[in-house]
Amino acid sequence: MHQISSGTRNMTDLSTYSKVRYLIPGNKKPVYFASKGGAEAQLNINADFEDIEVKINDGRCLNPPANLDKEGFELHNHKSMIADFYEIKNQQAKYEAELTNLVLPIIGGEKLVVFDHTLRSDSAEIREAHKIREAAAVVHNDYTFNSAHKRVRDLLDHDEAEAKLKNRFVIVNVWRAITGPAISSPLTCCDAQSVSEENVFASERRAKDRIGELELVSRSVDHKWYYYPEMNRDEVLLIKTFDSAADGRATRSVHTAFRNHLAPIDCPPRESIESRMMVFF
């Protein structure tokens, strides 16, 4: 059984302050152009943004720990048998079986479909060596109502998709550091209870193979941010990015990479993998 983190690994509260990048709403729908990876990979969005300093709380100090249906994210201990995540294409079936065994008991549901693995680093050298993408340093959520439903239809055959869409489904990211602890450019998640719909805006997402949507977010003094200091490869952060249930539980946790001012100058770069999956009920 995979244990939820108790938040006691760090005895010291490592809350910090940093700037996060918020959307400045305009008259036109923003367009996000997904990068192809590599040394020059960077965010490309045709919209205006502002960098706002916020408090980023130490999630390990939360008692009780955060959970998917309240805050929209939760931390778990999870040891993977994958030795080299840069070879994930050759080990997908193995890792996806691990993820299924982890996530289904946590969320419930009848079927889980893993459909994407994205590797990221804040090091140009590492991005170039492995042709991977940049850390996503803008406040966002991966799906809108429309794009979540479209993704189901993209991945399942017509009859199965329409049958699954009649019931609840959830999209979750499983994020983990793949080398040493994630100290440089870690991930921070916003408590879903602190995010108002008036601050969330649909954005077109254009990639080489398809067009979809994601959500960008404008600033609010109500937002409550959390991160888990020094996440290692034996921990995973589950982040809810869509939930079709309309019963008061969290539907998503907006998130972003941020500059960690507590990180030593010589700390190793961030290297991470995020795996996206759908859970059907």
Map each language-model feature to its residues.
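Catalytic core of Fe(II)/2-oxoglutarate
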Residues: 215-281
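Compositionally biased, intrinsically disordered low-complexity regions
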Residues: 9, 28, 39-40, 250, ...
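Basic/polar N-terminal segments that are highly enriched at the extreme N-terminus
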Residues: 1-18, 280-281
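Non-heme Fe(II) oxygenase catalytic core, chiefly the N-lobe of the double-stranded beta-helix
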Residues: 14-229, 266
